[in-house]
Amino acid sequence: MSDTAKRIAELEKELAESINGYISRKVIKGKERFYLQWTENGKLKSRYIKAGELEQTRALVERRKSLQAELKKLKATPDGVKSYNLKRKAVRNMQNITGTLMSEDHVIATVKNGVITDADERLLPLYLKRTGNIEGWLASRAIDPHRTNSRLLKRALRLRTTDDIATALAVNAATVTDRYWFKPEGSSAVYEDIRFKENYFAELALRGDPDSFSRKPSRTPELTNTGSFEKCWKLIDGEWWMYKSGNKEEYFSELFICKLCEKLGLPTAHYELDGRYIRSKDFTNGAAVNFEPIRALVDDDEDYENCFHVLYGISPEIAKQYLLLLWTDSVCYNMDRHTENFGLLRDVKTGKILSLAPNYDNNIALIAKGYPSDVRRTHDGLIGFLKAFLQDCEEARELYREMRLPEITEDIIDECLDEIPVEVDREYIRTFILCGQDRVRELIEMDGDLSEDEEPNMGLTL
């Protein structure tokens, strides 16, 4: 590869990962506001820029302009033209994605050379309804290639590829938590043939078990088990359980939030300890419903206001469920809510969106990364994020006021602590949770403007 081709590849990669759009200034009720705006699928999208992020956002927008100018110049050179022609040839020779996209044994889309030519819009996965990008959808279902045990798993399965699409297609892109799968052209397979009925590589995916290399390659749900932590699926008495590795603080945080939600009557995945690991029961009950991460609708934009408006457009009731999730995340200090760890449940037969999925993946919450230094939550970073959201989204604040929010008491906290076999600072947990609840309640009930000047404190005491 020539130096020009290498630089073009570098620029294209950086541009693909860079901020997109332009900065727009608005004056609302006499107050200056700035928004990042861009066009997506023919529609104008907008994201509020917080005061402390404005200069950085401006710099990123200017950086993108500079990259685009350099790329345009390089593509016009002889080496640039040659690189473009080689890339077109590679696309023509890429893996032939031709066949049918299935839901159980029902055809929901026809795919020819990577393009959807016919589809049942009712049942199509949400990501495909929005983008039509079958390659992106397939790639999103593959195991994270950066996990150490992912590489070991592929070696044990004799899978000679680093390509996410090929990895997913090795098991027809099937997963435990939905009934979608890909049927290659000419295949006579039915859903019963491809659905997962066993997993002989669970221990390899979870802990790098060396004995797994002696096993004969077989179908495993680990090739479509996404996420960055080492984990695995185990089939126990006919039910799938997700096992995950971690430390005692991560286990405590996951268990505490699970038990708290259960006692408050909030939808949650069930978690429990099993020896050295924590496990959670498949909340789709063997894909009785289809789970789809919110990334299907918003890509990587986890901004509260953006997600709220997207969900409100589906159903005000689902938007309320999202507000309850944000309430729990804020009170319990979940630092890692992103677009791959919350989502929607859909009816398998009709495609109807039923509800937000239950709360799960709280292993980077509460004290998972140490005891936050601001125990009384007076300058709490996550509550600050909620504050900014409520300031800019009056609809959300009004919905919160209409809702009957749960009430956490000291007795409920003590019950949760008593049921978790992990030693922690009980008084700290009580104070931290109750103060968080009080701060969030104050935000929701407050009538005036919420200050943007407060600097969030994300300090931890380790």
PLM region spans:
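Conserved protein-kinase catalytic-loop segment immediately C-terminal to the catalytic Asp
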Residues: 338, 343-345
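Phosphate/dinucleotide-binding and metal-coordinating scaffold of catalytic cores
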Residues: 83-327, 331-333, 345-462
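Conserved glycine(s) in the ABC-transporter nucleotide-binding domain "signature"
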Residues: 1-89
